[in-house]
């Protein structure tokens, strides 16, 4: 995005107001094309999606698209219509436009972010980007909480909501009208958020979703900071961002325990908010009454402001001492560790019972076995079976696939408090690998292992197992300590798919 600023020919004040002319500049398409080739997911660029076209024809495709946008009557053609002379459907051209949107609409955000960092010496810390970086924070904070609000963030049900969300940040009316026109003209709503079937660019989908969530969080944090200034006896909810205290839309009442209670929010300094994978959690030390108020606050926020039918069942109140919280692939809960301390004062000695509260992170073995069974690594009971679809590959390729999957799982779930379930998953993958190789060579598992020896299974020894085995000596006490130790890695930036080993 820093390269995009060099191409722009007007100052920063005009960049945020005039984005629409950029759709008719060929160098912007070249910029999007270069970024499409350098994406981490290794997908092919949309400009070379058609196998009949070589790289030298990409500029010709761009010129044809710009001519179609100048002549809007030619752009409004049913997506099923095919221009045989050009060899492309309008659907293909709209995919190119979505790539352009993904680049152009990020320009005002990147400029605003760069201006906010001017004059500040900030060090880049890639450790904070890791998924595992949140777990040490939870271990330190969750022991002081008793309730967690688990909220499923809903998607907008109407395209106009997305346009209105962008209206607060993109001031160019022409680009917004063009954006609205393309969405209503070509977008298939059923496949809008499906990355495999959607006609939109995945990067643009991610930008739309982040804008939608950013709008929700800005309102939530705004009300959260000012909740202590609102009266608890007659509380009226203001949802509009413009003239916030001047517009009254809804007057809410919540009936709890057969008594009418006005929905008033009390300021809680021990409130922590975490968002992940389309969900968010709200951890606090409030009472059940206040947690119910927060629950109905979220329901009314989505229904009144975003016009989304949001059911109260999508907001769960979990008590950490009793319920398990499904968080980033772990089952987290609070565990009470009783401790007995002997104290002696002068000639008298007595025992002191103490209880320590620790965060217990467990592996959801049932869901993982279900995922392995769905991908044909085992059956629904967890018994390993051969991977029939991989028997056409070479032995080294099969072994590398299983080793990579096993190491990814072991790497991510190294923070579990008990390793028994992790060892079971490793056992399933190891035996599945042996059965797959034995099936390929038309042999039994016992005969195959006898012929190759135990060196085959040593490939599954992960790097963290080797390091921990060097730190702790081989003894009964050390093995128990190794069984309980938790390791959080700060290099995990995304959740690896079990089968996606590319």
Swiss-Prot record:
Alphabetical list of InterPro entries matching this protein: Domain_X, Maturase_MatK, Maturase_MatK_N
Coiled-coil boundaries: none
Keywords assigned: Chloroplast, mRNA processing, Plastid, RNA-binding, tRNA processing
A single BP term in Gene Ontology: tRNA processing
GO MF terms held by the record: RNA binding
Keyword Chloroplast set for record: yes
Protein name: Maturase K
Gene source species: Sisymbrium irio (London rocket)
Lineage: Eukaryota, Viridiplantae, Streptophyta, Embryophyta, Tracheophyta
């Amino acid at each position: 995005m820093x390269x995009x600023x060099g191409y722009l020919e007007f100052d920063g004040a005009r960049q945020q107001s005039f984005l629409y002319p950029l759709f008719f500049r060929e160098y912007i398409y070249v910029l999007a094309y270069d970024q499409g080739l350098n994406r981490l997911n290794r997908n092919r660029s949309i400009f070379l999606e058609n196998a009949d076209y070589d790289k030298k024809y990409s500029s010709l495709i761009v010129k044809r698209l710009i001519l179609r946008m100048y002549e809007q009557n030619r752009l409004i053609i049913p997506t099923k219509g095919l221009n045989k002379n050009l060899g492309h459907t309008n659907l293909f051209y709209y995919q190119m436009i979505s790539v352009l949107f993904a680049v152009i609409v990020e320009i005002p955000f990147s400029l605003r972010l760069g201006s906010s960092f001017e004059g500040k010496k900030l060090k880049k810390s890639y450790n904070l980007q890791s998924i595992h970086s949140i777990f040490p924070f939870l271990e330190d904070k969750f022991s002081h909480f008793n309730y967690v609000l688990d909220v499923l963030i809903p998607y907008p049900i109407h395209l106009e909501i997305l346009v209105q969300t962008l209206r607060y940040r993109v001031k160019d009316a022409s680009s917004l009208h063009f954006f609205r026109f393309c969405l209503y003209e070509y977008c298939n709503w059923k496949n809008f958020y499906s990355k495999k079937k959607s006609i939109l660019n995945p990067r643009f989908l991610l930008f739309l979703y982040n804008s939608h969530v950013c709008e929700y969080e800005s309102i939530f944090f705004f009300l959260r900071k000012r909740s202590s200034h609102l009266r608890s006896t007659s509380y009226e909810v203001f949802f509009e961002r413009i003239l916030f205290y001047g517009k009254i839309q809804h007057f809410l009442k919540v009936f709890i325990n057969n008594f009418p209670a006005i929905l008033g929010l009390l300021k809680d300094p021990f409130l922590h908010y975490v968002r992940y994978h389309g969900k968010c959690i709200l951890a606090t030390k409030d009472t059940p009454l206040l947690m119910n108020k927060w629950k109905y606050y979220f329901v009314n926020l989505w229904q009144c402001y975003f016009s989304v039918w949001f059911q109260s069942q999508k907001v769960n109140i979990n008590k950490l001492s009793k319920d398990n919280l499904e968080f980033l692939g772990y089952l987290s809960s609070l565990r009470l560790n009783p401790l007995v301390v002997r104290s002696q004062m002068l000639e008298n000695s007595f025992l002191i019972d103490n209880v320590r509260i620790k965060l217990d992170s467990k592996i959801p073995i049932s869901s993982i076995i279900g995922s392995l069974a769905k991908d044909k690594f085992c059956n629904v009971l967890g018994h390993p079976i051969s991977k029939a679809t991989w028997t056409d590959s070479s032995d080294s390729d099969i072994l590398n696939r299983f080793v990579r999957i096993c190491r990814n799982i072991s790497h991510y779930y190294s923070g579990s408090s008990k390793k028994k379930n992790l060892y079971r998953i490793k056992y399933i993958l190891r035996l599945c690998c042996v059965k797959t190789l034995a099936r390929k060579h038309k042999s039994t598992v016992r005969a195959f292992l006898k012929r190759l020896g135990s060196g085959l299974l040593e490939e599954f020894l992960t790097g963290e197992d080797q390091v921990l085995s060097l730190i702790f000596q081989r003894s009964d006490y050390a093995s128990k300590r190794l069984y309980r130790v938790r390791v959080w890695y700060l290099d995990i930036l995304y959740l690896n798919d079990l089968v996606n080993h590319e």
